[in-house]
Amino acid sequence: YRKRGYSVIASDMMTYTKWHLITQIMMDREPRFEEVDIPSHHVSKYQAVLDYLNNLEPVEGYFFREFSPGGTPANGTASRKYFSSENACKIDAIRETINKWIASNCLSEQEEAVLKHSLIMAVNTVANISGTYGYYLAELKKNALEPLVLLPVRFSEGNIQNNRVIQGFAEDIAQEITADLCYIDPPYIKRQYAANYHILETIARGDYPEAQGKSGLRDWWDQHSK
């Protein structure tokens, strides 16, 4: 509908979905990243930022500790295998750099959205899972051994005027919206998105929650579908 000139309002409870939606319906070109102080080397600043993040030195941080076979979870459970140790260290390095840029006011909301969207998409390609992040596979499969790489977003043409992205529960947001056409996705009561995609939510928020139990779930009850 955006490509046909309509204004679009999109909402979801999850933070990672918010970043996807901002990238998809509120942007039609790559952001400039004017406040990020890195050399561009004759490529666009956006590509330079991706190259910089892709080539960071690995960091043995939160993701390495909690979600890789080389780590030792804080709660004393056996090491988890959501990612290879190498990719977990890359995720840590990229997350910490994005967090540093946010703290220094170097990123606009759209720039933050694009980077976190790209990181989440890259993470999905190397995750050692069967479909969701409810649990990991016993052994690292082939795709999990591939290196994590941030790829540029292909921005699409279309209307971006008066588009809105809202994060919250549909039953609350519906009272604020007037629209000609509405699509409402039914809630997932048994397979809660907040639990099954907890790792993506942690990447989206840029935080360091307590990883609970054997699977390393974050506290997600405030986002559960009712």
Model-identified regions with their sequence ranges:
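Conserved proline-anchored active-site loop of SAM-dependent methyltransferases
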Residues: 1, 10-17, 175-196
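Conserved dinucleotide-binding and phosphotransfer motif residues
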Residues: 4
